[in-house]
Amino acid sequence: MQGSRGQGELFSNALQAGSALTESLPLQQQQLLEWQRRLHAHQAPLFRREPLQSEQTDLFGAGGADPADAIDPLALTPLALNFWRWPESPHSGAAVYLVLDRPAELDQPLLLYVGETMAADRRWKGEHDCKAYLAAYGEALQQCALKPRLSIRFCTDVPQATRARRALEQRLIQRWLPPFNKETRQRWATPFTAES
């Protein structure tokens, strides 16, 4: 059965050729803009403080206020992503942090990542998954002749207890669906990756 062996090699070569082709295809500006528009369609009503269609009114008031509703990303002070290099950090202690971009083509920003920390002044020193995604995102924007306008914002009015703070982080992720959080990455079919 020498024929089946040859077919296997032929099939294997075809797969390798196909993967080389997809690696060499550049990201088009229109693809990136469309990706931003899809994310914006979900997040813009939240930035405008409009209720989500999926949120239903609690007729009996038993649910209580969701602490995630109280966090308005635009009310928080924007900082450069390299804030951690400054001689003195503007924040310390427990915090929830939000990474945003402000595309010129859209009427609202994009919330790209939500995180939590017990040490706001030290969290971004060293390795962080989000840094790699932001670098890939910034590079993709530049290759498409678009300008990134990234910022990070800290909310320090959060629970000190790690479990409660992580629960708040998860509520924010479920609400905003930021594309760089692992919980929601697949939803947005991100057209760029941090892998080389």
Please give the residue ranges for each predicted region:
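Solvent-exposed, flexible loop/coil residues
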Residues: 80-83, 128, 184
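Generic structural hydrophobic/aromatic packing signal, biased to beta-strands
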Residues: 97-99, 152, 172
